[in-house]
Structure formats: C-alpha cells, structure tokens
C-alpha cells in the first residue's frame, strides 16, 4: 500500500449520487471508491448530496471528502466552493479548475490562447436559427461533425453528424441540454486516446476502440465490446510528448491533483484535445483504474493515492 497511516485521513465522506444526468454512473463509482478506501483501513462513509444537506459533513465531523460526483454541481465548482466554505479538504480540482473543466466552450477558448491544440469548432446558442447556422457551419468546418452540449459529461447528448441535413435536428437536441452547443470538426484517422493524471504520476495512455461510431455514453458505461489498448501502441517518444501536452492541457485550466485529458490523433499523428475530466468515472468500465492496473496499481491503491493528495493542501 501507500505507507500512509489510515488514521491520518480522519473521517472521510465519499460524495456520490447527486442530481445530474450522470447520477447512476456516480452511484456506481462511489460504491467502488467507498469499498476501496475501506479495504485500505480508512474511515470512509457514503454521502449523497441529493439526500442530505452538505452542512451535515461539518456537523458529523468529516474532515475530508473523496468527490465521486459526476457532472452538474458535483463537477462545476459548486460542491468545491461549499467544501471550501466548510473547511473540508477534497479530491480533485478547486472551484476554478472544476468550473472551466466542465465547460467545453471556455475550455477550448483557454486552450486556443495557450497553444493546446483542439479541433476547429463553432458555437450555437439555444434559440438560434438552427437551419441557417447548420448551413454556415458545414461551409466552414465540413463533415463529419460532433455536436455536444457545452457542459455535460460522460458524452451525454453527444451526436456524430455525417450529413448537412441531419445537423439542424442535432443542434436542437443538444440545445435541450445546454444553452451553448459546441459543433466540432471530427478528427479522423488516428484514433481516440486518454491520458490519466494522478498527482505527479502520468499513467500510461489508453487507446479507446469503441465498437460503434464513437466513445459515447453506452460505450463508456454499458457495452462490454469497447477495446482499451494498454500499451496504446504509439512509439515511446510520442507517448511521452502526448503526456506532456495532456499535463499542460490540464494545468492551464487551473485543474489540480487528478483527472483525465481526452484527445484524438489525425492520420498524421497530430493531437487535438477534446476535454478534461476533473472527476473521472471510477466504475469497472472506467479508464483511470484500467491505466493504474496496467502498471501494478490496484483499485484500492489508486483511490488512496488520490485521497492522499488532500494531505498536501
């Protein structure tokens, strides 16, 4: 194990559930995190903010929290701000990094200004003339395209659009989830990868090969036919450089401690970063446990390592 006395952590709340579209994933993540911490002898307890007021954390003597909430207020800076107010240390990024990390639009603006490569994109606002915007966007970006709400995670409501005729309906659907919709040029030819970060540890890259069109919600959490390639098959020098860029993509957003950065490669091997995740899934389908396991780090050891980062705050 980590060599840290479990008593140093004090009473720990595992935050999971919540009220976002990712509630069910969070419940699964949280239960596994809870068991992993308990397996290491840590005094960990379940806590669902959808069912109990956050003030109970302070009232009941919790001193730190493992945030296994996904999406919504669990990942957009709100829970982080509340925990700061109550003086409870927590895993993952603070208010700024969490808020930026969940907002794909502002993430891309920061990356454009700091030299992190990201696919060309356009934004559409809820209520725009979707047919007119679709014509303009196809002329600028071509096809195929990805349409996604700016602030949903786990690929919720993400659609791949292959024809101009299908774009207006995709825009309308995405706009029911967020007032800002991102329309992104699809990067083809080199595959999808993720870089998992845990403190000073850059875990091995994972190449994701979904059975369907792309790595959507079903492929992430339901299907058993998605392939996860570790090692990812890239030359060592290229993998090292991609890890460096992933770390920069994470850092320039103000993200800290642990998370994930997802990117595509084109046919020439150029990387284009899609998003970061500041509270990654921790289910049996999730990527950080897979990456850790590939280098001999067990699930329990990983969650203890993540929680141990709160000792350094």
UniProtKB/Swiss-Prot annotation:
GO terms for molecular function: ATP binding; D-alanine-D-alanine ligase activity; metal ion binding. Residues 108-308 form the ATP-grasp domain. Mg(2+) 1 binds at residues 262, 275. The keyword Transmembrane does not apply. Mg(2+) 2 binds at residues 275, 277. Gene3D superfamilies: 3.40.50.20, ATP-grasp fold, A domain (3.30.1490.20), ATP-grasp fold, B domain (3.30.470.20). Keywords: ATP-binding, Cell shape, Cell wall biogenesis/degradation, Cytoplasm, Ligase, Magnesium, Manganese, Metal-binding, Nucleotide-binding, Peptidoglycan synthesis. ATP binds at residues 138-193. InterPro entries: ATP-grasp, ATP_grasp_subdomain_1, D-Ala_lig_Van_CS, D_ala_D_ala, Dala_Dala_lig_C, Dala_Dala_lig_N, PreATP-grasp_dom_sf. Its cofactor is Mg(2+); Mn(2+). The keyword Protein biosynthesis does not apply. Its EC number is 6.3.2.4. Binds 2 magnesium or manganese ions per subunit. It catalyses: 2 D-alanine + ATP = D-alanyl-D-alanine + ADP + phosphate + H(+). It holds the Pfam family Dala_Dala_lig_N. GO terms for biological process: cell wall organization; peptidoglycan biosynthetic process; regulation of cell shape. Pathway: Cell wall biogenesis; peptidoglycan biosynthesis. It comes from the Bacteria. One of its GO terms (cellular component) is cytosol. It is found in: Cytoplasm. Cell wall formation. Belongs to the D-alanine--D-alanine ligase family. PANTHER family: D-ALANINE--D-ALANINE LIGASE, D-ALANINE--D-ALANINE LIGASE B. This is D-alanine--D-alanine ligase. It comes from Burkholderia ambifaria (strain ATCC BAA-244 / DSM 16087 / CCUG 44356 / LMG 19182 / AMMD) (Burkholderia cepacia (strain AMMD)). The lineage of its organism: Bacteria, Pseudomonadati, Pseudomonadota, Betaproteobacteria, Burkholderiales. The gene is ddl.
């Amino acid at each position: 194990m980590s060599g840290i006395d479990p008593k140093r952590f004090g009473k720990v709340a595992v935050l999971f559930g919540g009220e976002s579209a990712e509630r069910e994933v969070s419940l699964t993540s949280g239960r596994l995190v809870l068991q992993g911490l308990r397996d290491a002898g840590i005094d960990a307890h379940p806590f669902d903010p959808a069912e109990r007021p956050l003030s109970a954390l302070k009232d009941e003597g919790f001193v730190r929290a493992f945030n296994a909430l996904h999406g919504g207020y669990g990942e957009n800076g709100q829970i982080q701000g509340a925990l700061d107010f109550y003086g409870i240390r927590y895993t993952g990024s603070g208010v700024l990094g969490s808020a930026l990390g969940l907002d794909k639009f502002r993430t891309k603006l920061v990356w454009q200004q700091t030299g992190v490569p990201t696919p060309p994109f356009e934004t559409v606002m809820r209520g725009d003339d979707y047919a007119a915007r679709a014509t303009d966007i196809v002329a600028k970006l071509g096809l195929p395209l990805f349409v996604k709400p700016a602030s949903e995670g786990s690929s919720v409501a993400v659609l791949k659009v292959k024809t101009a005729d299908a774009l207006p309906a995709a825009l309308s659907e995405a706009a029911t989830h967020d007032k800002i919709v991102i329309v992104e040029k699809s990067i083809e030819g080199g595959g999808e990868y993720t870089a998992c970060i845990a403190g000073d540890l850059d875990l091995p890259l994972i190449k994701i090969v979904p059975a369907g069109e792309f790595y959507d919600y079903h492929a992430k959490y339901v299907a058993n036919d998605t392939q996860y390639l570790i090692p990812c098959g890239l030359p060592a020098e290229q993998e090292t450089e991609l890890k460096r860029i992933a770390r920069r993509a994470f850092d320039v957003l103000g993200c800290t401690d642990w998370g994930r950065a997802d990117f595509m490669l084109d046919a020439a091997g150029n990387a284009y970063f899609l998003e970061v995740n500041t509270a990654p899934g921790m289910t049996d389908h999730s990527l950080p446990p897979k990456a850790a396991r590939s280098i001999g780090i067990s699930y329990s050891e990983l969650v203890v390592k993540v929680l141990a980062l709160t000792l350094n705050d």
